[in-house]
C-alpha cells in the first residue's frame, strides 16, 4: 500500500463495504504553495485555490480507485488557498477533492461536494474517464434547468490523481564538483547544434 507502516497509527482505514470515514488523522498546517499535491520525501503538502469555497476535503481512494476510504478536511486557509500537510503519505496514493460552498448559480457559484474534482495540478492520473451526465452539477431535464442541483456522487467514475515523487534518481552519477570560475554555460538550439553532426543518424 502507498503508505508507511507508521501511517496506520494516524489514519483509520475503512473496511470493505463500510462508509467513508471523516476521522481526524494527523494533519499539519502545511503551506499554501506550491499548489497541488507535493511529496517532499516524508509526506505531502496539499494546496488548492478557491476564493469562495467554505471548506475542502482531500479524498483518498483504494488502489483500484473505486472505493473512497478517507476524507480529510484541509485545516488552513491562506491567500485564498486551502492547505494542509499529511505526514507519512507516500507516492502511489490515489486522491481527489470535494469542495463545499454556496450553490447559487445566479451568482456564479456551483459548489457541489457530490462531484469529485480532479486536482488541476495533478502530475499523474489513474483510471479511464467514463462519460455520464452525472458529471453535470445540475439535473438534466429538470424544469429549473441549470438552476437545479444534481447530488449523484461521481467518485467511482472520475479519474483520480496519483501522488508522485518528483525527485530524479541519479543512480551512480555524482556532481562534477567543478568550480564556477572553470565553468562555461552555453545555451544552444538542439537542432542547430546537432543537425549536421556526422556521427548522428538522420
What residue spans do the PLM features occupy?
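Conserved, mostly hydrophobic/aromatic
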Residues: 48, 97, 188
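Low-acidity, Ser/Thr- and Arg-rich intrinsically disordered low-complexity segments
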Residues: 1-13
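Phosphate-binding active sites in nucleotide-utilizing proteins
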Residues: 190-202
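Surface-exposed loop/edge segments in extracytoplasmic proteins
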Residues: 65-72
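The feature marks proteins involved in alpha-glucan
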Residues: 11-40, 68, 77-81, 89-185, ...
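Beta-strand signatures of extracellular beta-sandwich domains
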Residues: 57-59
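Structural beta-strand segments of beta-rich domains
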Residues: 42-46
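Short proline/glycine-enriched turn/loop motifs at strand-loop junctions of beta-rich domains
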Residues: 49-55
